[in-house]
Structure formats: structure tokens, C-alpha cells
């Protein structure tokens, strides 16, 4: 049958890797693992999706990825270049695995995949990513800790800049679904002036 055939292929004498689809959400990988394959030669890869709104939803992505992660199999997903001009399909909506990633900067896509703890390898689905994108991708992938890109207001003060960028922020344990709270700066800089300015209603994404 198909599963025993895949098992035999993982035990090839040449070290050839056998890559199977991660995105379907079936028990295919469980059936293969029941035959005790050589897991050094068995890899999983998510699909990429060229049409807008056809990419994986996050919950399904996690569900599918965990099926492979529980066996400690190497996993891969695709991110989308915004400088690329072509892919395997005529449409040019990008070529990512997660639909949520389609319009995000490539570094943000990579950071998200890394933070899931579910993906080992990340590839660019469309061609060709720019040198700047590849550099940003590599920096995000190899970063010692996660970072958030912050676009500052022109009126930012020097004390605010120091509080934002000269610290390793830690996320409070009593976490919220709506905000990331880093509170030690109010201890470190309690004697610095932080006058109110650029006041307006806070919207999603504000710091």
C-alpha cells in the first residue's frame, strides 16, 4: 500500500529525503509512522497558496503541524516575497502557506513561524526575493530572541526612544489577549520625564 511504499522509500541507501504534504490534516503521517520509517529521511512540508483567501487558517495550520511535530519530524512552510514577480501560477497574490501572512513583511512572516515552535525550515514561495528581503528573513530566523518592529512618531522624545529600544523587554506573566505588557521600564526610568504628546485614541498595533 501507499504507506508501506513511503516507508520503503525512507529506507533508501542513498539518504534521499522523502517529503510529504503537511496541509491536508489527514492521518497519513500517522499511518506511515505505524510502519517505523527512517525518520531521518522523512520530512513534512506545508503547501503554498497563490490565490488570495485560499491559504491555510492559523488553527488548521497548528493542527496539521502538531501531527508532524509529535513525531519530531522536520517541518517546512512557505513565506511570501513582495518583491517577487512570478511563481508557478499566472496570478500574483503571493505564495505563502498561511493566509494571514499574505500582506505582511517577510521578516514578520518568519518571526511568526519561528514563534509557533512548529516549523524548522522556511522557504520563499515566489521568485525572486530581494537581497534586502533575504537579509531580513535570515536576521529574523536566527534572532536570539523575538523582536517587534516599531515605527516611531516624529515627535518621539529621546527618553522614549531609550525606553523603547535600549532594553530587552519581557512579557508579563499575567498575559492578555489584547496587549503585550512590558513594565520594567517604569522602574528603570521612574525619574525621567515622559510628557503626554501626540494624544489620540489607541488603535490595534499602537505602542
Regions found by a protein language model. Give the residues of each.
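A generic, well-ordered mixed alpha/beta core segment in the N-terminal half of proteins
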Residues: 6-31
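C-terminal functional modules
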Residues: 151-207
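Short, small-residue-biased leader/transition segments that mark boundaries at the very start
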Residues: 2-4
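Catalytic alpha/beta core domains of metabolic enzymes, predominantly
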Residues: 23-154
Amino acid at each position: 500500500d501507499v504507506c508501506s511504499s513511503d516507508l520503503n522509500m525512507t529506507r533508501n541507501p542513498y539518504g534521499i529525503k522523502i517529503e510529504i504534504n503537511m496541509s491536508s490534516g489527514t492521518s497519513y503521517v500517522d499511518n506511515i509512522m505505524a510502519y517505523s520509517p527512517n525518520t531521518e529521511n522523512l520530512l513534512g512540508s506545508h503547501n503554498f497558496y497563490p490565490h488570495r483567501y485560499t491559504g491555510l487558517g492559523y488553527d488548521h495550520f497548528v493542527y496539521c503541524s502538531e501531527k508532524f511535530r509529535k513525531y519530531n519530524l522536520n517541518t517546512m512552510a512557505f513565506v511570501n516575497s513582495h518583491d517577487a514577480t512570478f511563481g508557478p501560477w499566472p496570478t500574483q497574490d503571493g505564495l505563502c502557506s498561511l493566509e494571514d501572512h499574505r500582506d505582511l513583511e517577510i521578516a514578520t512572516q518568519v518571526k511568526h513561524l519561528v514563534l509557533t515552535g512548529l516549523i524548522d525550515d522556511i522557504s520563499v514561495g515566489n521568485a525572486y526575493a530581494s537581497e534586502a528581503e533575504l537579509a531580513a528573513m535570515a536576521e529574523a530566523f536566527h534572532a536570539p530572541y523575538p523582536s517587534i518592529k516599531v515605527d516611531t512618531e516624529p515627535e518621539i522624545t529621546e527618553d522614549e526612544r531609550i525606553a523603547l529600544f535600549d532594553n530587552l523587554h519581557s512579557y508579563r506573566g499575567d498575559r492578555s489577549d489584547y496587549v503585550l505588557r512590558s513594565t520594567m521600564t517604569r522602574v528603570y526610568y521612574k525619574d525621567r520625564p515622559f510628557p503626554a504628546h501626540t494624544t489620540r485614541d489607541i488603535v490595534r498595533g499602537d505602542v
